[in-house]
Amino acid sequence: MTDENRSIVKQGLSFLNQSCPIQIKALLNQAGYNNTINEETVGFIIGPRLNAVGRLEDASLAAELLMTEDEEEAEFLAEQVEHFNVERKEIVAQITDEALAIAEEKVNNGNQFLLLAKENWHEGVLGIVASKIVETYALPTLILNIDLEQNHAKGSARSIEQVSMFEILSAHQDLISKFGGHHMAAGMTMEIDYIEALEQGLNDWMFKLSEHTSLEPTKHVSVKLEENDISINNIRDIQRLSPFGTDFEKPLLEIDDNEVVDVR
């Protein structure tokens, strides 16, 4: 969220709030959302619903919704999109439960890179599942669906700040049919016969890295506050800095020596 991207997002959010298109309004109606549209609305409400269609089937329904100019049709199509989103959540929950069970065993065995593979996992949601595993264990994770008929495994990987997923997969590309990605994420296809060797290689790589690099999760505190720093004016000043996103994260504030009385 830097440079011209930041300017484009800010103008886009302003437009959505001043004159929200019927297509987006229909999506938000289905989600039961009627507040100010900000970057989190786009990232966690609008985006996932549009993506859900393409993840599970063909994205043409989402495209049809975005192109319609009829309000009644927009509501009808948005309702269908919402059904896909509900189904996507159910599939993610099921696969995540299965993946967490496998991950727990591997973590207990000392694995520092989690390669989780199983048949009949929907490939369209494996990136989401991988992110949830990373959130739980703070370890780089690769989730693969095994296709016995095609004799290959296909899936998505998510990483942690200290580990470049692109670098670690590049170091083992002789075991991978094809892959692409960046520091924090990747997608890949490989032959089933190489899964065990890849898992061993990735963990060996991680063990060498851990000899000189801490893999502990880190938090970067933006500023430490005193109690008298907490005011409506300061909160509004922080909000004026939005939109937040990659490379311009929402500030993390630290307050020491305070007792938590209530959580809502």
Identify the function of each model-found stretch.
Residues L169-Q173, E199-M206:
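Short amphipathic alpha-helices in soluble, non-transmembrane regions
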Residues L13, P21, D204-R264:
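A contiguous loop/helix-start segment that scaffolds small-molecule binding in enzyme catalytic cores
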Residues A59, L126-I128, E199, I232-I235:
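Conserved strand-to-helix beginnings and helix N-cap segments that scaffold or border functional pockets
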Residues M1-D193:
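Hydrophobic helix-and-loop "lid/oligomerization" segment in the mid-to-C-terminal part
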